[in-house]
Amino acid sequence: MANLAVTSQFNTAMEAMTTKTPGHCDQWNSRHEQLLGNDQYLKDQMDKMLVNGAGSHNAIYRGKNLTNIYTVDQICAMISDGTFSDLFIGDYFDVSINTSIGGTETVRCVIADLDTFVLNGDTAVSKHHAVIVPKDCFKTTAKMNDTNVTTGGYVGSKMVTTTLPIYATALQTALKNHIITHRSLLTNSVATTGNSNAGAGHVGYSNNWAWTDTLLSLMSEIQLYGSTVLSSSFFDTGERNTQFNLFRHNPAAKIAGQGHGGGRMWYWLSAVVSASAFANCGDDGLSSHK
């Protein structure tokens, strides 16, 4: 089979075919070549303006469904080589996970940021990476702790010690072991007396932290909102002090459903608010706590 000749040229006009146009392949081929030439021209112009890499691709929100275009391995190859060649903020793909908590469910993985943590940490992150945020909450609710305490800070919570590791294992399987561990500065102690930076009479605040191996984590307030709102002290932020580009470009992305495609649902954040509450993002977008 012969290939059509493709010339990078933008064609602004194309001869229309009529009922009297001979139905010969040459008539079709010449028009297809014009269309292919347009595509190539536009691609060439885009390549001139856009250099592959985290900086430029972080600046563009696309929101494209990659599920039936690339495999997980192909997506991760574009991440690990640092080009992010056909990956942009808001692009997403679906995976299926199975856990002892929620059984089988679909997770829509949204690209929220690229190379966010490069050179961060007490051990610097050296690998190219993409931050993935699920579009929706997992379908089964979970507590931060069994009682209304924040003892041990974020790291000491039941969410971190028991719940998140179960989902991390399931997601690691679904993502073909491509999730990388990074070091994150997370709260591990809370003073039960003294005013919280949350204000409004909240008592108790995070008063220590430690570098911790992290595979799966709740977001900080800054990663979601771009600023602290109810965080009890500077210990609640650590190195997680940059808003993900997903929420900068598309603030509506902070609203999540319960389970894949479910109705609106609030979700936990990592910040301690007081001796008895952690921060959350409400189903109505409100910065709140429980």
Regions found by a protein language model. Name each.
Residues V51-K290:
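Collagenous Gly-X-Y triple-helix signature in extracellular proteins
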Residues M1-D47:
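Extracellular "spike/adhesin" assembly and maturation modules
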